[in-house]
């Protein structure tokens, strides 16, 4: 059995990253795939479920896990801590499950150092205007927060060239097709196919 692949997916807020990942998992039942669920010390928001949206833990628990080097990466954001579980991801990959990690460029850098076999994708909006329109359409943030997100988007986008693949989410269906094509191509690489079809290859290569 071949190991799963870790996919690092980054994008500015509003580019459609979460929607594309969710659509991929819902419409691609052929492969075993999961989304990594981060640990966080922030409080649970209405509608969130522990273990689904995040693994909610205390600051003390987070500190202990950090000291045990249980996180592939971790960061502090607005006074709250977030981390990606190393044991969980390694367990899924060893089972042949592809794991998708929704993370910013800084976290992506940390993970690529520790797991160089990971594949990285960056999702771009077609324009600044469209990105701002999407942020406004969500109806979640004030004008001040949207302005800050637009500033953050420029910083995030400036690192797109550090990624293996780039998808422009102008048309959602087309972007989803591109996303699926990347996963399919990675699954067809020689090392993956060799592990999957090892018995067949041995039979084909056996002397008569």
Swiss-Prot record:
It comes from Photobacterium profundum (strain SS9). One of its GO terms (molecular function) is ATP binding. The keyword ATP-binding applies. Belongs to the guanylate kinase family. The lineage of its organism: Bacteria, Pseudomonadati, Pseudomonadota, Gammaproteobacteria, Vibrionales. It is found in: Cytoplasm. Keywords: ATP-binding, Cytoplasm, Kinase, Nucleotide-binding, Transferase. It comes from the Bacteria. ATP binds at residues 11-18. One of its GO terms (cellular component) is cytosol. PANTHER family: GUANYLATE KINASE (PTHR23117:SF13), GUANYLATE KINASE-RELATED (PTHR23117). Residues 4-184 form the Guanylate kinase-like domain. It catalyses: GMP + ATP = GDP + ADP. This is Guanylate kinase. InterPro entries: GK/Ca_channel_bsu (IPR008145), Guanylate_kin-like_dom (IPR008144), Guanylate_kinase (IPR017665), Guanylate_kinase_CS (IPR020590), P-loop_NTPase (IPR027417).
């Amino acid at each position: 059995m071949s190991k799963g692949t870790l996919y690092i997916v980054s994008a500015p807020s509003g580019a459609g990253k979460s929607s594309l990942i969710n659509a991929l998992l819902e419409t691609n039942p052929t492969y075993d795939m999961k989304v990594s669920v981060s640990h966080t010390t922030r409080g649970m928001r209405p509608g969130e479920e522990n273990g689904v949206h995040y693994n909610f833990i205390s600051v003390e628990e987070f500190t202990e896990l950090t000291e045990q080097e249980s996180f592939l990466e971790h960061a502090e954001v607005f006074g709250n801590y977030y981390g990606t579980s190393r044991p969980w991801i390694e367990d899924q990959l060893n089972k042949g499950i592809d794991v998708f990690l929704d993370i910013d460029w800084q976290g992506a850098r940390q993970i690529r150092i520790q797991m160089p076999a990971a594949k990285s994708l960056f999702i771009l909006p077609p324009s600044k205007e469209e990105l701002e329109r999407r942020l406004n359409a969500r109806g979640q943030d004030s004008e001040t927060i949207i302005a800050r997100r637009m500033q953050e988007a420029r910083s995030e986008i400036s690192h797109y060239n550090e990624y293996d693949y780039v998808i422009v989410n102008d048309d959602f269906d087309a972007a989803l097709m591109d996303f699926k094509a990347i996963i399919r191509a990675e699954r067809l690489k020689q090392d993956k196919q060799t592990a999957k079809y090892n018995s067949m290859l041995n039979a084909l290569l056996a002397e008569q």
